[in-house]
């Protein structure tokens, strides 16, 4: 038997073996290992920028043409990462959208397995009712809608309002853990209190009601801008006095936490606010897991991987897993950031790499 004949025979036997693999529902590891176990994360998501000046007019046009009601439920426009063409996903685990509610409109009640939050860049006049607790939405506020809580929104003014929604939809979808249920057609409450019941019970710094147990998601349903602003201001002032507290020179940051556990406000998403003093440039950082940033106020330059984004109020950009990110503040700039880091920490997969200031 010649070498060529031997090779042909071996090839035929291998082809038959692989055909049997396919028939048996098997895939050999030796043909897949590079894709299954890369040397470092190879995210499908790509760095991308969405400009508020472009998003808001589209939201306004949608408000004129698309009604809110059963079926669509929400007038929300999801950010679609170019790495996931045709899918409403910003990252493999995070979904974010601009939601727009017109004057006197109501978004009906429903609930779902996915956890959610609202972050308000501008405007006021909408109350979100979470399990019957009316929560005012104002500029700079973070509002929580934990998993499986009934929620609805009502605009009590003659002006429209837009805000940022963040949910863990892609994660819950991949885990095959999603449930959804419609709520009553009528609003659970038309009250418009200055402070929600959740704030009255849980919104006292360093104090918690003894009679209430720990909860996986924060029972404090509103984190008000006045407190966030004061905390960031104090960090930068104390830095000037030589008191440690900032992340790095000129870079203050706070994390929204669950008052019953001290951990993240939501079990699957980390929510933070950052403030950079004008002229500050942050050190490059890489983190396992993805993040989405939105400029609340000010102007900066964001370097994400090999992309450079000029960013201003309302602009959003995505940082894929293990993609280097750094910021340069042209003015004092405040940025809201949310990520999937709690998931990776719970799984023991979290990793962060910090570079040197350039």
Swiss-Prot record:
Catalysed reaction, written as an equation: 2,5-dihydroxybenzoate + O2 = 3-maleylpyruvate + H(+)
Enzyme class, broadest EC rank: oxidoreductase
Disrupted gene: phenotype observed: Cells lacking this gene accumulate gentisate.
Inducing stimuli: By salicylate.
All residue ranges annotated as the Cupin type-2 domain in the record: 99-165
Compositional bias (Basic and acidic residues): 187-202
Single annotated GO MF: gentisate 1,2-dioxygenase activity
Tagged with keyword Metal-binding: no
InterPro entries: Cupin_2, GDO-like, RmlC-like_jellyroll, RmlC_Cupin_sf
Sorted UniProt keywords: Aromatic hydrocarbons catabolism, Dioxygenase, Oxidoreductase
Entry EC no(s): 1.13.11.4
One example of a Gene Ontology biological process annotation: catabolic process
Ranges for region Disordered: 185-215
Family: Belongs to the gentisate 1,2-dioxygenase family.
Function: Involved in the degradation of salicylate via a pathway involving coenzyme A derivative. Catalyzes the oxygen-dependent ring fission of gentisate between the carboxyl and proximal hydroxyl groups at positions 1 and 2 of the aromatic ring to form maleylpyruvate. The substrate specificity is strong, since salicylate, catechol, protocatechuic acid, homogenetisate, 2,3-dihydroxybenzoate or 5-aminosalicylate cannot substitute for gentisate in the ring cleavage reaction.
Protein name stated in the entry: Gentisate 1,2-dioxygenase
Gene that encodes the chain: sdgD
């Amino acid at each position: 038997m010649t070498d060529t004949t031997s090779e042909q025979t071996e090839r035929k036997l291998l082809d038959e073996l692989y055909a049997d693999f396919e028939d048996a529902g098997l895939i050999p590891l030796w043909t897949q290992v590079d894709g299954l176990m890369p040397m470092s994360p190879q995210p499908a998501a790509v760095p991308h920028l969405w400009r508020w000046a472009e998003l808001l007019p589209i939201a306004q046009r949608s408000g004129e043409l698309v009604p809110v009601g059963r079926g669509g439920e929400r007038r929300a426009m999801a950010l679609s990462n170019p790495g996931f063409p045709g899918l409403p996903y910003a990252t493999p685990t995070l979904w974010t959208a601009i939601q727009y509610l017109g004057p006197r409109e109501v978004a009906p009640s429903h609930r779902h397995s996915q956890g959610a939050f609202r972050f308000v860049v501008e405007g006021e006049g909408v109350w979100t009712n979470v399990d019957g607790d009316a929560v005012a939405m104002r500029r700079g506020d973070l509002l929580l809608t934990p998993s499986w809580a009934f929620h609805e929104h009502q605009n009590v003014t003659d002006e429209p309002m837009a805000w940022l929604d963040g949910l863990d939809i892609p994660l819950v979808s991949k885990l095959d853990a999603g449930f959804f249920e419609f709520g009553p057609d009528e609003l659970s409450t038309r009250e418009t209190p200055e402070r929600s019941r959740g704030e009255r019970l849980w919104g006292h710094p360093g104090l918690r009601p003894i009679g209430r147990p720990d909860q996986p998601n924060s029972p404090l349903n509103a984190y008000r801008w006045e407190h966030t602003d004061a905390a960031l201001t104090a960090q930068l002032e104390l830095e000037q006095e030589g008191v440690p507290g900032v992340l790095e020179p000129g870079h203050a940051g706070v994390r929204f936490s669950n008052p019953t556990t001290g951990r993240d406000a939501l079990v699957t998403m980390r929510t933070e606010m950052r403030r950079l003093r004008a002229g500050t440039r942050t050190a490059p950082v890489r983190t396992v897991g993805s993040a989405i940033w939105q400029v609340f106020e000010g102007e900066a330059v964001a370097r994400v991987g090999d992309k450079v984004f000029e960013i201003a109020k309302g602009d959003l950009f995505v940082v894929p897993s293990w993609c280097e990110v750094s910021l340069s503040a042209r003015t004092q700039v405040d940025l809201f950031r949310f990520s999937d880091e709690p998931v990776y920490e719970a799984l023991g997969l979290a990793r962060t790499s910090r570079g040197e200031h350039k």
